[in-house]
């Protein structure tokens, strides 16, 4: 199992709990994530877990909670080019949610419960290369809130605890 994190900040607490886990800092955004995954040379036996913080639309997902993304869509593409990536089965016992991958703050959810900046790249690469993709996100904020209101530390700590549970179960 390989754990991908967009930033060192998101990975730090997990590294402290699981120092022997394979952690890769993929970079922020779809391009950086796709390039990082391509450099790993994944095969069908690999499981890549994309981990990080995310924003929630509305009140359906609580700040501080940890979820598994089971459906991901890049909503910034014109509608006729959009593809929804669906997970056939959840990988974890976490609540499954639908997510949008965005590069700019989207105040419209398009039916998603959360947003992030890397997930669609993970699932596109999984389709192309045949590895198992899992996306686990901790909710740090409500979409549209200013950064000073985000609960990054709380979210990163909650994420690390859930990932440790996943690591211990493998």
Which ranges hold each PLM region?
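Glycine-rich phosphate- or other oxyanion-binding loops that anchor nucleotides, phosphorylated ligands
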Residues: 2, 7-170
């Amino acid at each position: 199992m390989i754990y991908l994190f967009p930033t060192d900040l998101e990975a730090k607490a997990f590294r402290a709990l699981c120092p022997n886990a394979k952690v890769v800092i993929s970079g922020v955004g779809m391009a950086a994530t796709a390039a990082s995954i391509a450099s790993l040379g994944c095969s069908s036996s690999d499981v890549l877990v994309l981990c990080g913080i995310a924003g929630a639309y509305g009140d359906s997902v609580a700040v501080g909670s940890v979820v598994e993304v089971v459906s991901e869509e890049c909503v910034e593409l014109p509608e006729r080019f959009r593809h929804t990536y669906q997970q056939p089965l959840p990988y974890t016992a976490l609540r499954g949610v639908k997510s949008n991958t965005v590069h700019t703050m989207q105040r419209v959810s398009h039916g998603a419960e959360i947003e992030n900046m890397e997930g669609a790249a993970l699932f596109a690469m999984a389709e192309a290369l045949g590895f198992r993709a899992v996306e686990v996100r901790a909710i740090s904020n409500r979409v549209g809130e200013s950064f000073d209101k985000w609960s990054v530390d709380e979210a990163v700590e909650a994420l690390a605890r859930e990932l440790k549970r996943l690591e211990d179960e493998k």
